[in-house]
Regions:
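Terminal amphipathic alpha-helical/low-complexity segments used for targeting or macromolecular assembly
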Residues: 1-110, 175, 181-182, 187-199, ...
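Structural signal for interior beta-strand "rungs" in well-ordered beta-sheet cores
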Residues: 44, 106-247
Length: 247
């Protein structure tokens, strides 16, 4: 991945209340740790235990806390802020838009959409997606091989990465990010031991993820036995996590 950011563009992104020390004339073409940064790179101090590494860093631009007082090297710009780590996140968010742009709205010719499904004209439906009967998909992005079950709902501005499965009747809120391979709405683990054998208990509930939920790759969230397994607004779940039914 390649990019080029002027110091002026960096300052526009991180905010106009930053303080400056030193000067760097040129573009930033990389982001690296304090120890590994070279000329033309940007680095930051997010953890106080690495404070001593700032003085020896070769980075051309440094995002630092406001209380940092050491003098920058020649050709080095220090940008001092309340939260350098968050400032870096703002920069990366801007870079992501150009490095990984969202696909344009439209339906790939290999996708299958049931005649009774409703798909927003602002949605992007990727190759080999399958959208079931009665499903509703808002202005979302579905990458390749996503499956949305019968009567499921996907909210606006959500991004479903490759091979995500949304089970029947499940509800995905707005601005969700569901990473590759995660399964929302698989059966909960429900059995009764009857006459010497385990008998399956049907799981007739669903999963509801509220707004701004992130679910990591290959995570499974079980549908409820009845009612809903609810993932609250703003929840962030890592990769390879299993959420049991009715939580």
């Amino acid at each position: 991945m390649s990019f080029a950011y002027t110091t002026q563009r960096i300052l526009e992104i991180v905010g106009d209340d930053a303080e400056f020390s030193g000067e760097y004339i040129g573009e930033i073409a990389g982001i690296a740790s304090l120890a590994e940064a070279m000329a033309g790179d940007l680095s930051f101090l997010g953890n106080p235990k690495y404070r001593d590494a700032v003085a020896s860093s070769a980075a051309s631009v440094l995002l630092l806390p406001r209380d940092y007082t050491e003098t920058p090297k020649a050709g080095q710009l220090q940008i001092k802020l309340d939260n350098p780590s968050y400032a870096l996140a703002l920069l990366c968010r801007d870079m992501e838009r150009s490095l990984q742009p969202l696909p344009a709205p439209g339906v790939h010719p290999t996708a299958f959409i049931d005649v009774d499904a409703i798909v927003s004209p602002a949605a992007s439906i990727g190759p080999f997606c399958c959208i079931g009967k009665g499903a509703v998909v808002g202005a979302a992005v579905l990458e390749a091989h996503v499956c949305v079950g019968k009567y499921a709902n996907v909210g606006d501005e959500s991004h479903l990465f490759s091979q995500v499965v949304i089970g029947d009747y499940c509800v995905i809120g707005e601005r969700n990010r569901l990473h590759p391979g995660c399964v929302i709405g698989s059966d909960g683990y429900g059995y009764e031991f009857i006459d010497g054998a385990h008998q399956r208990v049907p799981q007739i509930g669903n999963v509801v993820t509220e707004a701004d939920v992130d679910v990591g790759a290959n995570t499974a969230i079980d549908r409820a036995r009845f009612g809903s397994t609810v993932i609250g607004a703003g929840t962030k779940i890592d990769n390879l996590v299993q959420i049991a039914h009715n939580v």
